[in-house]
Structures are given as C-alpha cells and as structure tokens.
C-alpha cells in the first residue's frame, strides 16, 4: 500500500512538472542542440561518442570550472572570501597538482572512460535524440546520482581516514591543508578508483540515456571543484541545493583532517556526529567576531 502511495505521489509530481513545462516558452537553444546531437550521431560511432565524447566533456568541464578559482588568487577583492587567507596558493603547489592531474586523467581515468561504450551497451543505454529525457527528469536524475554518490563517498572516505591505511592512500589528497579548485581530483590512483566507483552507481540506477552520463559528470565536477575552491563566495547558486555542504564545510575537513567526510550533503555527518568539531569551530568563530565588533 505504501509503495503504491509513493508511486502515485511521484506520478502526480511528474504530471505537475509536465503541466508547468507546457506553459514555458520554447527553449531557443533546443533546436541548435538537437541539430548538433544528430550531426554527432550521423558522423561518429557509438564507441567514439562514448569514449572521446566522455573524455572531452570531462577534461573541458574540469579545467573550465577551475578557471574562476585560479583567477581569484590574482584579485585582491576576492581575498576577503578566501577561507584560509593565511595559506595562499603557490605556483610550486599548483604545478605539482597539475602534473599529478594529467597523469591521473590519462593513465587512470582514460582507461576507465574507454570502457564507457561497453558500459552503455551492457545496460542498453540509448544515444538517440528521441530517447533523451526532459530537462526536469535529467535534473532529478542528477540529484539522485548525487545522493547515492554522497553516501558512498561518506563511508569510503571515512574508511580511508583509518589510521592503518590513511598514510598509504588518502594522505596524498591531504597534502594541501588549504585546498584550491584544481586540487579536487588530486589523489592517489587507488583513491581515484575507490571513491570514483560511487560515481557509477547512480548511473546504473537512473541512466536511461547517455546524456545523463555527461550531465552527471558536469554536475559532479561542479560540486567537487566548488567545495575544494577555498573560497566561500556569496550568492553561490549551489547554496540553493538543499543540505548542500559547500566550500567552508569541506575546507574544514582539509584543515582539521577529522570530520566532514561527505562530498555533497551534510546529513551523513550530522547523523553520525562527525560534524561536531566543525560546529564547535563555527561557534568559536562567531564568538570571536562578536568580540571584535564590541572592541570596534
């Protein structure tokens, strides 16, 4: 009975969104996107689309999303939003990070990306324009992927902090006490495989089109680069996402090494009490700010 009620609620929500969508003006980008998509299908094989298309989406998204944070270090005005202003980025650290990223991207991630075609074939994931989900379905699927990945990340990330294995794998990612955007995927190859596995679970559960794979890549990179940016920017649209952790939450993890293990949302740390030191730290910050206001 409860299952039927849940299904009815979801169906009603879907119909409500479809009804609202029918009143929205036509998207002027839809036709050019459709033409480009069909051109891609007509001129490239599924293997080329799944492999080189996925690589292009990942690399372009990753480095383009890193650009704002990279530029911020040269803008004095933005320094007031830097979470750890006493630990600026250095060229030496950024160059070291970049070299490791290139190695991981092309020697660890590329072989995995080469399996994307076989992944889509095994699960019968379509490529055709006619099978593409509506924007609100795609958005909901990406959110579902984020919820699943966040749960995987919390428990496996916490395991990687165990004293018996931390120094062998996860210590690499913690070389930078004050993170910066490009450092988001700076990790030991084993960590890339272990934590990266959570990315694909949601795809297996929700994926009904290859476009979700690419949309989820972009969403996941947007989130992980944001939380590693080192800047708590006001009016950040990602803060509109319910229970979103954000840069300040994850920055504390790099600064403190303990707690705040989740990747995207705050609920797992709240449930298991692993955000207690972060909460105490925020309270201490508030008291310091109040004292400063009184003295001024």
UniProtKB/Swiss-Prot annotation:
GO biological process: sterol biosynthetic process
Histidine box-1 (motif): residue ranges: 157-161
Cofactors that this protein relies on: Fe cation
Pathway: Steroid biosynthesis; zymosterol biosynthesis; zymosterol from lanosterol: step 3/6
Keyword check for Endoplasmic reticulum: yes
Residue intervals passing through the bilayer: 55-75, 100-120, 199-219
Any one Gene Ontology cellular component term annotated for this protein: endoplasmic reticulum membrane
Locations listed in the record: Endoplasmic reticulum membrane
Pfam families xref list: FA_hydroxylase (PF04116)
Enzyme Commission (EC) number: 1.14.18.9
Substrates-to-products reaction catalysed: 4,4-dimethyl-5alpha-cholest-7-en-3beta-ol + 6 Fe(II)-[cytochrome b5] + 3 O2 + 5 H(+) = 4alpha-carboxy-4beta-methyl-5alpha-cholest-7-ene-3beta-ol + 6 Fe(III)-[cytochrome b5] + 4 H2O
Gene Ontology MF terms: C-4 methylsterol oxidase activity; iron ion binding
Keywords recorded for this protein, A-Z: Endoplasmic reticulum, Iron, Lipid biosynthesis, Lipid metabolism, Membrane, NAD, Oxidoreductase, Steroid biosynthesis, Steroid metabolism, Sterol biosynthesis, Sterol metabolism, Transmembrane, Transmembrane helix
Residue ranges of every copy of the Fatty acid hydroxylase domain listed in the record: 145-274
Chain positions of motif Histidine box-3: 249-255
Short sequence motif named Histidine box-2, residue ranges: 170-174
Membrane topology: Multi-pass membrane protein
Family: Belongs to the sterol desaturase family.
UniProt free text on domains: The histidine box domains may contain the active site and/or be involved in metal ion binding.
Name of the protein this chain belongs to: Methylsterol monooxygenase 1
Gene source species: Gallus gallus (Chicken)
Species classification: Eukaryota, Metazoa, Chordata, Craniata, Vertebrata
